[in-house]
Regions:
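Short glycine-rich, Thr/Ser-proximal phosphate-binding strand/loop in the N-terminal lobe
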Residues: 2-45, 142-167
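Short glycine-aspartate micro-motif
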Residues: 2-6, 61, 125-129, 218
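Glycine-rich phosphate-binding/hydrolytic loop that grips phosphoryl groups
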Residues: 111, 166, 193, 234-260
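Phosphate/pyrophosphate-binding loops at sites that engage ATP/ADP/AMP, CoA/4′-phosphopantetheine
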Residues: 43-59, 203-215
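Adenine-nucleotide phosphate-binding core of ATP-dependent small-molecule kinases
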Residues: 26, 176-216, 236-238
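Phosphate-binding/catalytic loop of phosphoryl-transfer enzymes
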Residues: 83-86, 92, 96-164, 194-203, ...
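Conserved Rossmann-like nucleotide-cofactor binding loop
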Residues: 10, 133, 225
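Short beta-strand-loop/turn "lid" adjacent to the catalytic site in phosphate-handling enzymes
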Residues: 52-105, 142-147, 153-154, 183-193, ...
Length: 260
C-alpha cells in the first residue's frame, strides 16, 4: 500500500491506495506546533483504524502547501516506515501541462487535483477547491493549465468577520432557510452560504466568458464545505472530494512506472 498526504493550511488528508483503488482517506487538523512524533502517533492511529500495518506501506507521496511541515512529515515516514516519500514539486512528473508564467508558483494541491481531473473529465474545465482559500483552476480545451483565481476561503472569511466585529456573534455552521435573514444569526448564515454560492457562480460566468465556451466544473476540498455550499450554486457542479488523493495516486505511479 502507498501512504499519501495532502497537507493544507487547515487540514491534512491522509490516504492509502494501491494500483487498483483508493482504500481509505481520513482528515486531521494542521497544527504547526505538533512534533513529528505527535503526527506519527496520529497517523499510526489512522492506520490502525483502517487495519493497515505500517509494514504494508511500500511507498509514499506528499503534496504540501505548508513548506515548513515537509521535513516534519519526512520524519513521520521514517518513524513509521522504511519509505522515503515523493514530494510533489519540481523534478516530479505530474502529467500536467502547466502554461503559466512561473510554474514553480503553482501550489502542489492545485497540481494534484488537476492531474486527476484531466484524466476523469472533459476539457475545458474549472476545478474549484474549497479549503483555507477558495481556488478556481482553469484548464483549456487542450488540457493546458492556464491559470487560477484565488480568494479567501469560506471559513477563513467567516472567522475574520466574527473576530473583527463587536456585535456579530459566533454562530453554528448551519444552512439558512432563506436568503433574507431576520436575525443576526440567520443573516450571517445567509451571507456564508448564499454569498459564497453566488460568488462561485459569478466567477464561473466570468471564466467561461473569457474562454468563450462553457466548461466542465468540478468541486473538491473540504467535504463539509462542498456538501453545504455547492448545492446553493446555480451552475451544474460535480462534487469530487477524492480528486486530490486520485491525483496523488496518478502522480505516484507515473513516477514509479508501475501504473496500469
Amino acid at each position: 500500500m502507498i501512504l499519501a498526504l495532502d497537507i493544507d493550511n487547515t487540514a491534512i488528508t491522509v490516504g492509502g491506495f494501491d494500483e487498483e483503488r483508493i482504500w481509505f482517506t481520513s482528515e486531521v487538523s494542521t497544527n504547526y506546533l505538533r512534533t513529528a512524533m505527535e503526527y506519527a502517533v496520529m497517523l499510526k492511529s489512522i492506520l490502525d483504524i483502517h487495519r493497515v500495518d505500517p509494514a504494508q506501506i511500500e511507498g509514499g507521496i506528499i503534496a504540501s502547501v505548508v513548506p515548513g511541515l515537509n521535513n516534519t512529515f519526512k520524519e513521520v515516514f521514517r518513524l513509521l516506515t522504511d519509505v522515503n516519500p515523493f514530494i510533489v514539486g519540481p523534478g516530479l512528473k505530474t502529467g500536467v501541462n502547466i502554461s503559466i508564467g512561473d510554474p514553480g508558483e503553482l501550489g502542489a494541491g492545485l497540481v494534484v487535483s488537476a492531474a486527476a481531473a484531466q484524466e476523469k473529465y472533459e476539457a475545458p474545465m474549472i476545478i474549484i477547491d474549497l479549503g483555507t482559500a477558495t481556488t478556481f483552476s482553469v484548464m483549456n480545451r487542450k488540457k493546458e493549465f492556464i491559470g487560477v483565481v484565488i480568494y479567501p476561503g469560506v471559513l477563513l472569511s467567516f472567522n475574520a468577520l466574527t473576530k473583527n466585529t463587536a456585535q456579530l456573534p459566533q454562530i453554528p455552521f448551519d444552512r439558512p432557510g432563506k436568503v433574507i435573514g431576520d436575525s443576526s444569526q440567520a443573516s450571517m448564515q445567509s451571507g456564508m452560504f448564499f454569498g459564497n454560492a453566488a460568488l462561485i457562480d459569478g466567477v464561473i460566468d466570468r471564466i467561461e466568458e473569457e474562454l468563450g465556451e462553457a466548461c466542465t466544473v468540478v468541486a473538491t476540498g473540504m467535504e463539509r464545505l462542498c456538501g453545504h455550499i455547492i448545492p446553493y450554486c446555480r451552475h451544474r457542479i460535480r462534487i469530487d472530494t477524492d480528486l486530490p488523493m486520485a491525483g496523488l495516486r496518478s502522480i505516484y505511479y507515473r513516477n514509479t512506472k508501475r501504473r496500469k
